[in-house]
UniProtKB/Swiss-Prot annotation:
Species this protein is from: Glycera dibranchiata (Bloodworm)
Annotated family: Belongs to the globin family.
Keywords: Heme, Iron, Metal-binding, Oxygen transport, Transport
Protein name as catalogued: Globin, polymeric component P2
Cited CDD domains: Mb-like (cd01040)
Subunit structure: Polymer.
Amino acid sequence: MPLTADQVAALKASWPEVSAGDGGGQLGLELFTKYFHENPQMMFIFGYSGRTDALKHNAKLQNHGKVIIDQIGKAVAEMDNAKQMAGTLHALGVRHKGFGDIRADFFPALGMCLLDAMEEKVPGLNRTLWAAAYREISDALVAGLES
């Protein structure tokens, strides 16, 4: 079910706090370190190896995390135009086809780690709302991945 105009407005209003500081770079890094800690088998698929705590100093992972959070920010900015947002994310999913064995079943766990990292950064975050937003974002991306 699509997000309502009020929900989109609430997401947009909370985004500056979510991405505050370094534009979300640290948030993206926390997302991936949580994800790899809970799903160590995924490190290889994403092109990483070693201990998950050592990854906090990996420049490539830091950049990847920032790129992910930037893309979420773009999706939030486009959420009041669902067709535009879906098109942008669909194209992103298509580009990810060339990055190896990325499958739709990776996204729920990644989303949980994202929500955990967001909630740690922003206590009182509306997790239910952000979970719904993540579903819309990941569904559009997966549609491109599977096209």
